[in-house]
């Protein structure tokens, strides 16, 4: 056993960094959170092969946690998600996979951090995101 056994390794996750809401219209949600709630934009990035996706994060000034405003996944509204942060996405991926957790393969696009998606037993989405500050 020992540390070479990934099932015995401690978690590398250090923070719940992002809560994710599914919104019908990212621009309308952005206007609400910035104009009415006083949040600031933390990220607004196009990604994907043809820039077809938009990652949009807002937060209250000074907050370390962010709120992502996501379009519906798989064209269906609903479904909760959180983003958790780790300094080593690949180590956490290996650890969870060794424990029998179904995880998607890590992915990275220019301008976005390396990450992978997984679900808890109830189907809630969890994005495991590599951060240099985690």
Annotate each language-model stretch with its function.
Residues 107-110:
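Short loop/turn motifs at secondary-structure junctions and domain boundaries
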Residues 37-40, 100-104:
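A common structural junction motif
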Residues 15-24, 54-61, 65, 71-99, ...:
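Vicinal oxygen chelate
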Residues 4-8, 55, 68-71, 103-104:
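A generic local structural motif
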Residues 8-11, 34, 74, 118:
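Structural motif
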Residues 2-30, 79-82, 132-134:
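N-terminal beta-strand motif that seeds the catalytic metal site of vicinal oxygen chelate
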Residues 11-14, 20-64:
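Core segments of cupin and vicinal oxygen chelate
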């Amino acid at each position: 056993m020992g540390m070479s056994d990934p099932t015995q390794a401690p978690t590398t996750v250090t923070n719940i960094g992002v809560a994710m809401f599914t919104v019908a219209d990212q621009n309308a949600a952005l206007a609400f959170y910035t104009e009415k709630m006083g949040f600031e934009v933390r990220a607004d990035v196009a990604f994907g092969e043809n820039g077809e996706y938009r990652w949009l994060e807002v937060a209250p000034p000074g907050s370390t946690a962010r709120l992502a405003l996501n379009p519906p996944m798989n064209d269906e509204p609903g479904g909760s998600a959180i983003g958790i942060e780790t300094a080593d996405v690949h180590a956490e991926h290996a650890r969870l996979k060794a424990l029998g957790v179904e995880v998607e393969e890590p992915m990275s696009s220019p301008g976005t951090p390396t990450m992978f998606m997984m679900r808890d037993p109830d189907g809630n989405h969890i994005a495991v995101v590599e951060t240099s500050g985690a």
